[in-house]
Amino acid sequence: LHYFLAGLFTFLLIRTIGAGWVGALLGAVVYSFGGFMVTWTHLPSLISTAAWLPAGLLGVELAFRGRPLRGMLLLALALGMSLLAGHFQIAAYVWLVSLGSGAAHLVYRFAMRRRPGDTHPSPVGPAVALVAAVMLGAGLGAAQLLPSLELSGMSPRGGDRVSPEGYEFHRARALLPIELMTTVDPDFIGSPVRKNYPVWRISYSEHCAYIGVAGAVGVFLALLLGYRRPAVWLYALIGALALWTAMGGLTSYVYYFWIPKVGLAGGFSRLLSVFTLCAAVLAGLGVDALGKRTACSPTSCPPCARAWPLMLVALALTQALPWAYQFNPRTPAGQVYRPTELTRHLTDLANRGRVLEITEPEKWTLFDLPEALLPPNSATVYGYCSVNGYDSLLPTTYRRFADRVQQGIASPAANGNMILISRAFEVPICRYYVSSTPLLGEDELHGAERFRLVYSSAEGYIYEDRTARPYAAWRPDTEARAESAYDWESVQARRLGANRVRLEYIAAETGQCLLSEGYFPGWIASVSGQLQKPKLADETFMQLSLPYGDHRVDLVYRPASVEAGEFFSLLSLMAMIAVAVAARVSRRNCPESRT
């Protein structure tokens, strides 16, 4: 779907600029099957967001080409959908490039209007369209934007600050000059498919700048033959700035230190998304210029006049499609995360307690192939509860807790943002531990009170910690605060969904209930109809005050930021629909307005 959207919007963008269908088709192929879209398919949020970049630029072009209402609606849709797609670094590119293009159009329009006898329309209408699009786009994306802003304030990433050390860290991983050869040959350095990609380089996806031979020829033709078009210079400038920043040039300093938060996200090389699109637009304009230069006239017709542009499109398809299919072969869904005996046991244990997959952090780096027991996010696929995860999606309180357990940094920069706890076996923080090698010998297991071997095979080993605190535990207020996890009594708990938990208990006196659930604002507890907000306890968990008697407690995760975001998103969507319908009705009632 997102390959199609990326290609469709790129095609329409190039056509709107003024190129023919052949050039637009080449540009669509170059972007939708370029290095960024193809190699990031395994992380769908990136390509889902990048697909809206040409839509944003198309909205700007429409706004300045006599269709400000359509341009405003499309730009608002692109800005809002880029936020909803879920990858804020790429969404920032959509916003920056689209609005930067709009600003460039405004400057050009104002400059042209100052020339005597100029007939360009007033820039006021497009300027109003841009402002309205920003407001509607922000409102449309509020369902994702507001909760993410709340999470960033709680996340360990939210408190990060730019620093010279951080800048050098990103520059060391920037695109190298030799890697520019991947623009025409994606496997020039090597390929993970053929398993000859150098282990000393950062991931293949980060540094694949592929646009194809036909795309490169099209860019050259645009600069050689189509230089009279202002659009050629605009997209050449944007593409050059994106590429220079991706290579860690002077502009990367501005990008890192001057653009709030964006520089702290992934590496500079993800600006290849912008470069690839600009190259695609230039390729389309270049082929169009070639077609016009070689067009037949009443008196002469150059050899193969109409064939040259089509030959470039054919070359782009024959080079891009086999490579894309080889890199992302069609695979049955069941083969991606294939169930094994180990994962079946973990799924069976899902309702009994949390699981820690022990992976040594030093074995997980940005350069070496990770030696992990199970792939990241496998707990989500197989349906068990893991205590590992991404530090950008977990609160700072949990990161501090993980660092204390790890007796160091549980998520060092070298392994991205994975929280990998390997020393938790020494303290009872979860019920089950999974490892690729035995954690205890047979003599240590024999007669052990704490650990029990649940499963063992060539895949791995599962141990149960019988002293681990239950998911929900209770103690009366009359007791002194327990130092040990075993002093708490278990409370019957059932998870009714991702955001709902039910507790049932009978107590002879008032007490405190500690839940081994990460504390987030937004949890609301209903204790037999009485609402209560859980409190932060033991660094990262939740605690409730429970009255005596027979009670049922229903916990629901319903943060105000989500409800407010959904309200503003629906309001913006309704406003956009109302504007579109009103414009349609107006055109029907006033036929002369169509001319």
Which ranges hold each PLM region?
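Membrane-embedded helix bundles of polyisoprenyl
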Residues: 3-17, 21-109, 126-148, 315-323
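Transmembrane alpha-helical segments of multipass membrane enzymes and assembly factors
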Residues: 9-23, 59-68, 225-229, 286-293, ...
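Membrane-interface helix-loop-helix junctions at transmembrane boundaries of multi-pass membrane enzymes
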Residues: 110-128, 218-253, 296, 301-306, ...
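Hydrophobic alpha-helical membrane-interfacial segments at the cytosolic entry of transmembrane helices
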Residues: 117-149, 162-166, 235-243, 310-315
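Signature aromatic-anchored transmembrane alpha helix within multi-pass, membrane-resident enzymes
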Residues: 130-135, 281, 287-321
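Periplasmic/ER-lumenal interhelical loops and adjacent helix-loop junctions
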Residues: 137-223, 268, 344, 392, ...
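Extracytoplasmic
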Residues: 158-167, 318-490, 496-508, 518-520, ...
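Active-site-proximal, structured, solvent-exposed surfaces of multi-pass membrane proteins
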Residues: 217, 244, 454-458, 463, ...
